[in-house]
């Protein structure tokens, strides 16, 4: 049931200079004095009932690392392009090629979370897969003082429901799938179930497994390799 989709380009925006993270791709992020802790609510827009997560992350994380956290926490496969949008800014992975057609696209590894959305109630959008166009609304719920003893750099605090499967046709396609698997007599029930896999349950939310996988994202020099490892081992993640 996979769909053929053409990746679209982001809308051109004005570019302004944002602070560069002095430790990007050099040292792991650790909670320490002076580094605020963000509580973010992430809502997958258009899903009914809502698919959402509540995350705790350090405010000095860059958006490239946040992308890795979102992929693991939501349940995506990191097999499509993505971008962050806030204000009039667009940020993405420079290896995606988006900057080739739009030089105003910022390098996500040089944009810091606390600079992009510095205040409580600030919002940004994380779009994954420009064909299916999965838009995640990210809302700053709380900004807390850092706990010097904190050891986890990313934590899922709460959430609900499983992530839709990649390549299912976006919100409309996923809604159709949910209707089909409710009725074993539906003519597409067997093929849809086979494509989804027997273990897929749209109501499943495994907080323990998500956090076990998030602990693999320690962000030393290569976020991408650690994300790849976390996704490959996701089914086997244990406490």
Feature-to-residue mapping (PLM):
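Short linear regulatory motifs enriched in tryptophan with gly/pro/ser
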Residues: 1-239
């Amino acid at each position: 049931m996979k769909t053929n989709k053409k990746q679209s380009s982001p809308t051109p925006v004005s570019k302004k200079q944002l602070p560069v993270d002095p430790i990007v791709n050099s040292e792991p992020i650790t909670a320490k004095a002076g580094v605020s802790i963000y509580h973010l609510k992430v809502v997958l827009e258009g899903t009914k009932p809502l698919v959402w997560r509540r995350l705790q992350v350090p405010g000095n994380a860059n958006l490239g690392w946040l992308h890795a956290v979102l992929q693991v926490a939501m349940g995506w496969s990191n097999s499509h392009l993505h971008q962050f949008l806030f204000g009039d800014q667009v940020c993405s992975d420079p290896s995606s090629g988006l900057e080739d057609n739009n030089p105003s696209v910022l390098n996500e590894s040089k944009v810091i979370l606390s600079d992009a959305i510095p205040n409580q109630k600030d919002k940004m959008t994380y779009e994954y897969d420009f064909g299916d166009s999965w838009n995640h609304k990210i809302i700053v719920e709380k900004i807390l003082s850092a706990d010097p003893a904190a050891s986890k750099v990313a934590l899922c605090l709460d959430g609900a429901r499983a992530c839709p499967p990649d390549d299912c046709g976006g919100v409309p396609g996923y809604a159709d799938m949910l209707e089909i698997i409710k009725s074993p007599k539906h003519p597409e029930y067997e093929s849809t179930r086979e494509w989804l896999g027997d273990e897929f349950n749209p109501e499943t939310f495994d907080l323990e497994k998500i956090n076990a996988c998030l602990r693999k994202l320690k962000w030393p020099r290569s976020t991408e390799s650690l994300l790849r490892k976390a996704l490959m081992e996701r089914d086997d993640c244990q406490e």
